[in-house]
């Protein structure tokens, strides 16, 4: 009975947040996307957690993102372009890369910085017209064991972060499921699946785009 009441309360809270975001002023970047008439209701629902997060992160210096665009905007754009599931997988991959080692890998590849605040420029769509010695397909396959694909692509530290992220989400999902938590169980299983496939996509992306340039063919 208690769980049913909690589920109903959460549904009402999410509905109120969704409606208020839908009709409020576009104070935060993702609000513009949510209020757009060009995307479906399903995508807008997927963007709701990002909207909530931006209301926290944009009002605290503790949550400043080192990337441009920020991880929340990156994820929002991915959902808008590729749909909720694929977009969340792509967003998960970016969040894994948003770690203390990002600046090292960025400088190693001589990638650009955002002029206004020095953040690391990293868009969804990359335009590197070069051949890589690493196989994106092979990187994806070996990522069946999380982290192995990124390590193969030359990003061992990102691989460790990916392995740790998958472990945390998966172990949390198993714990919640074993305790028969009807709310957190399915939710965390979904998160675990997203981070796992995000790791596979991240290995593919690392092997295809984030490689040292031997020939300047851009």
Question: How does the language model describe each region?
Answer:
Residues 33-218:
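Hydrophobic alpha-helical membrane segments
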Residues 2-13:
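Positively charged n-region of N-terminal signal peptides that target proteins for export
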Residues 28-32:
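Bulky hydrophobic segments
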Residues 22-26:
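Boundary at the C-terminal end of the N-terminal hydrophobic targeting segment
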Residues 12-21:
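Sec-dependent N-terminal signal peptides
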